[in-house]
Amino acid sequence: PGTPGRLNDLRHIIYKPADAPWRRARKSLGLMLREGILKENIDGEALLWAHDRLLARNEDRRIMMVISDGAPVDDSTLSANSGSYLERHLREVISYIETLSPVELLAIGIGHDVTRYYSRAVTITDVEQLGGAVVGQLTDLFDEDANKQRHRVA
């Protein structure tokens, strides 16, 4: 076919299930550093998968934080489709989540400007800044909520 769609296989890894205690996840978290475990970046489908997992949870509030070091890439898919195929899909998924979903979406780009994709996003230049960026993003989100509450009461 002329435009076959995504051609690469997917690998979604759960390093720590939400209900598992941190102490049981140590070994799994170490797998993040294992060479060859990750596939190419098919970000739109990964977001949808994580989004659906969050929706299945019975929580009052669901927050998804994306940490990205680059744009969606899959050489096979990009060679058989338009060069913007994966990026366009990512933008569609983000738009859906940000406008129609109860899931709150935040993003942090490491050496990659994610503010062009996500409404609530920040870009850092070094992984050493990640801890502060995570806390900052969550603080901003909760401050937004506090401001909304104050405006409702006033």
Segments from the language model and where they lie:
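Acidic, glycine-rich A-domain
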Residues: 1-154
